Every structure is written in C-alpha cells, then in structure tokens.
C-alpha cells in the first residue's frame, strides 16, 4: 500500500512566486492547498481594493490549479507582534525592517502553527527566493539561486526546526523562469508586478502612513560643522545615507557634492547632514548587534570570519565577529562601510549558507 502524499499549505499572496510554488509542489507529488493571510485591517478604499484584488488573484490561481484556498485573519497578531514594535523603533529614532519581523512572527510562526494544527499540514511553503539543505541532521538556510532576487536576508530569524517544516520551490529557479512557467500555465498572476513597500501594508505614501500613527516633530537640520541649513519634518522620516527628500536643495552651482544624512541626534531632535556619499561621518568600521538569531540555534562564542550584509541587496562585506556578553556581538569590517543604520539587520553568511543575524544596536564610526 503506497504512502499517502505529504500535505503542504502554500502561503498564497496573490503574486506570481506563490502561484508557481503551488504548481511546482503539485508536480512533485504533494497534496497542495493554499492559505491567504489577511494581516492588516484596511481603513481606506484604496487599501481595501488592493487586498480584495490579491485575494481574487489567489483564488483564481487556486481554481486554475484545482486546489482549495483557505483564508485566515492574522491582523491582531500582526498589530501586536509586528506593527507596535515597528512604531516603537521609529519613535526611538531607529529604522526597523518590518518584513523581517513579519516573517518571524507571522509567516513562520502564526501561519506555521495554523497550517499544522488547524489544517493538518506536514509542511508549509512560501514563494521566497531561498533554498534549504539538510546538513548533519539540521536544516540550513541557503541563498536563492537567483542572486538578484535572493531573500535570505529577510529570513535569518528562522531556526533549523522551522526551515525543516518549510519548502521554498522557487528558490531553485531564476525569476524569469518563474514568470515563464506562470505564462505557460495561463495564470492571472504571470505579469503581476512584484510587491514593494511594507510587508502586508502595501504600496502607499510612507510619510502619510507613518503620520497617521506617530505625530511628526519638526526640528533643525545642521551640518557636521554645526551650521543650521534647514528644518526636517520628523526624524522618523529620515535614514542614514538618505539623499532625497531633505528639502534643503542642491548646491548652488551644481558642482559640489549633494547633502546626505550622516546622523540623527534623537535627544535634541536634530538631523545631521554632510556632503558626499563617502563623507567620513557616514562611514563605519564595524557595528554592535543584539537580538541575535542563529539558524543552527547554537549560542555564538569566540570569533568567526564570515561576510555580512547590513542592508538588503548589499554586496557581501568580509568581516570578523567577536562575541560580547549578554547575547551581543561586535562586527569589524575589513573595509569601512557607508550608511550602517541602527534598527536594521546585520545578516551573516558563510558562502551560500545564511548563518543568522541580529539587529544593529549601534555603528562603530570611522570618525568620532
């Protein structure tokens, strides 16, 4: 008697990657069902229309593939475990990455638990561009085969136990191949553009959105030499290395370097700027990271040579990690790096393998 196929619940977002993931798993012999997660309570017409369209696309794909689509509302979990922390970080003058938190708390926690306990799933699957490999009895997280779309940076908080319960079908493909499969299958999502913006909140004017929840506090813009040259509308709207949207204009004759944000004085509500994207005040020789997550779930001790990304799509930076007390590490770069931003994540790699990462607590500036 043959064994019944393993059941996989695919997180269906209404996008092309999850659509093709569902089909690929069908081809591999799994019993596939979809789950559409509603993680945000829309409060205006535009938001509602986007969410409704995504659900309709997910349903159309599932109908085409002949699979059942479940829906679940995780809006309360998202608000409590992602959004409130996101606002707290902005209030503190840091720049958080909500997509990482959303993966940790929603997609690979709330969704994983719901799929296993309520839907009887053996695995969950998502349309992330990452791969998994089993080494010495532990599942490892690998970069996606398409280096341009690799999303391992956003999944570093996952432990080997979660990865063992997760499948990433498109991680073995390149994006154009995924779109070609969707076109050949006649899926409505084939030409749908990739979503951008905050995880589950979608594409909207970020400044307007943030302003709904946090009151703006205007303050001075000063240069590194102490000259006041303008006014900002709120530190939360600015991040290190930012050039656009400062409202201080360019240089008079257009020959000098443009202004960049090099620091935020949260205590005094002052934005500090300098000219040139390689200004010494913008450069860091390293960083201190906290809230560490290692994929193998082993505590880190001692010293390690590896590479690090301090933001998504950044070229890997060779570095040395030194363990500090209290679950913190010091990271020293081989060469100075621009715009290392507190609140963002530092993610570590050994070749193709994502080792884990942590939140940047502070940068170690090139100049003090």
UniProtKB/Swiss-Prot annotation:
<feature type="site" description="Interaction with tRNA">
    <location>
        <position position="344"/>
    </location>
</feature>
<dbReference type="Pfam" id="PF03054">
    <property type="entry name" value="tRNA_Me_trans"/>
</dbReference>
<feature type="binding site">
    <location>
        <begin position="11"/>
        <end position="18"/>
    </location>
    <ligand>
        <name>ATP</name>
    </ligand>
</feature>
<keyword id="KW-1015">Disulfide bond</keyword>
<keyword id="KW-0808">Transferase</keyword>
<keyword id="KW-0067">ATP-binding</keyword>
<dbReference type="InterPro" id="IPR023382">
    <property type="entry name" value="MnmA-like_central_sf"/>
</dbReference>
<dbReference type="InterPro" id="IPR046884">
    <property type="entry name" value="MnmA-like_central"/>
</dbReference>
<dbReference type="GO" id="GO:0005524">
    <property type="term" value="F:ATP binding"/>
</dbReference>
<feature type="region of interest" description="Interaction with tRNA">
    <location>
        <begin position="149"/>
        <end position="151"/>
    </location>
</feature>
<feature type="binding site">
    <location>
        <position position="37"/>
    </location>
    <ligand>
        <name>ATP</name>
    </ligand>
</feature>
<feature type="disulfide bond" description="Alternate">
    <location>
        <begin position="102"/>
        <end position="199"/>
    </location>
</feature>
<comment type="subunit">
    <text>Interacts with TusE.</text>
</comment>
<comment type="similarity">
    <text>Belongs to the MnmA/TRMU family.</text>
</comment>
<keyword id="KW-0963">Cytoplasm</keyword>
<comment type="function">
    <text>Catalyzes the 2-thiolation of uridine at the wobble position (U34) of tRNA(Lys), tRNA(Glu) and tRNA(Gln), leading to the formation of s(2)U34, the first step of tRNA-mnm(5)s(2)U34 synthesis. Sulfur is provided by IscS, via a sulfur-relay system. Binds ATP and its substrate tRNAs.</text>
</comment>
<keyword id="KW-0819">tRNA processing</keyword>
<feature type="region of interest" description="Interaction with target base in tRNA">
    <location>
        <begin position="97"/>
        <end position="99"/>
    </location>
</feature>
<dbReference type="GO" id="GO:0002143">
    <property type="term" value="P:tRNA wobble position uridine thiolation"/>
</dbReference>
<dbReference type="Pfam" id="PF20258">
    <property type="entry name" value="tRNA_Me_trans_C"/>
</dbReference>
<dbReference type="InterPro" id="IPR046885">
    <property type="entry name" value="MnmA-like_C"/>
</dbReference>
<feature type="region of interest" description="Interaction with tRNA">
    <location>
        <begin position="311"/>
        <end position="312"/>
    </location>
</feature>
<protein>
    <recommendedName>
        <fullName>tRNA-specific 2-thiouridylase MnmA</fullName>
        <ecNumber>2.8.1.13</ecNumber>
    </recommendedName>
</protein>
<keyword id="KW-0547">Nucleotide-binding</keyword>
<dbReference type="InterPro" id="IPR014729">
    <property type="entry name" value="Rossmann-like_a/b/a_fold"/>
</dbReference>
<dbReference type="GO" id="GO:0000049">
    <property type="term" value="F:tRNA binding"/>
</dbReference>
<feature type="binding site">
    <location>
        <position position="127"/>
    </location>
    <ligand>
        <name>ATP</name>
    </ligand>
</feature>
<feature type="site" description="Interaction with tRNA">
    <location>
        <position position="128"/>
    </location>
</feature>
<dbReference type="InterPro" id="IPR004506">
    <property type="entry name" value="MnmA-like"/>
</dbReference>
<dbReference type="Pfam" id="PF20259">
    <property type="entry name" value="tRNA_Me_trans_M"/>
</dbReference>
<feature type="active site" description="Nucleophile">
    <location>
        <position position="102"/>
    </location>
</feature>
<feature type="active site" description="Cysteine persulfide intermediate">
    <location>
        <position position="199"/>
    </location>
</feature>
<dbReference type="GO" id="GO:0103016">
    <property type="term" value="F:tRNA-uridine 2-sulfurtransferase activity"/>
</dbReference>
<keyword id="KW-0820">tRNA-binding</keyword>
<keyword id="KW-0694">RNA-binding</keyword>
<dbReference type="GO" id="GO:0005737">
    <property type="term" value="C:cytoplasm"/>
</dbReference>
């Amino acid at each position: 008697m043959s064994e019944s196929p393993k059941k996989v619940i695919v997180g269906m977002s209404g996008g092309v990657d999850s659509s093709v993931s569902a089909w690929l798993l069908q081809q591999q012999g799994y019993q596939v069902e979809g789950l559409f997660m509603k993680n945000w309570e829309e409060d205006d017409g535009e938001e509602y229309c986007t969410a409704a369209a995504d659900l309709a696309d997910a349903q159309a794909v599932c109908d085409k593939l002949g699979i059942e689509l479940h829906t679940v509302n995780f809006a309360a979990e998202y608000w409590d475990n992602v959004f409130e922390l996101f606002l707290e970080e902005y209030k503190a003058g840091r720049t958080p990455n909500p997509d990482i938190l959303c993966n940790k708390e929603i997609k690979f926690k709330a969704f994983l638990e719901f799929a296993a306990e309520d839907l009887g799933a053996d695995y969950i699957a998502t349309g992330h561009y990452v791969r998994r490999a089993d080494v010495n009895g532990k599942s490892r997280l690998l970069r996606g085969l398409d280096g341009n779309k690799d999303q391992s940076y956003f999944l570093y908080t996952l432990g080997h136990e979660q990865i063992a319960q997760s499948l990433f079908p498109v991680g073995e493909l390149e994006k154009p191949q995924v779109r070609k499969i969707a076109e050949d299958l006649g899926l409505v999502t084939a030409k749908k553009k990739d979503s951008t913006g905050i995880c589950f909140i979608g594409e909207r004017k970020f400044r307007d959105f943030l302003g709904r929840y946090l009151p703006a506090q205007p303050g001075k813009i000063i240069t590194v030499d102490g000259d006041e040259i303008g006014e900002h509308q709120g530190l939360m709207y600015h991040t290190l290395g930012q050039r656009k949207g400062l409202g201080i204009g360019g240089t008079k004759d257009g020959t000098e370097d443009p202004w960049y944000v090099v620091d935020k004085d949260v205590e005094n509500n002052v934005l500090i700027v300098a000219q040139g994207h390689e200004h010494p005040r913008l450069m860091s020789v390293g960083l201190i990271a906290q809230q560490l997550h290692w994929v193998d779930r082993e505590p880190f001790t001692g010293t390690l040579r590896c590479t690090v990304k301090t933001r998504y799509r950044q070229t890997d930076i060779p570095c040395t990690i030194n363990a500090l007390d209290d679950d913190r590490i010091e990271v020293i770069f081989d060469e100075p790096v621009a715009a290392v931003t507190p609140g963002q994540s530092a993610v570590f790699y050994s070749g193709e393998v994502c080792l884990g990462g942590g939140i940047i607590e502070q940068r170690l500036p090139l100049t003090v």
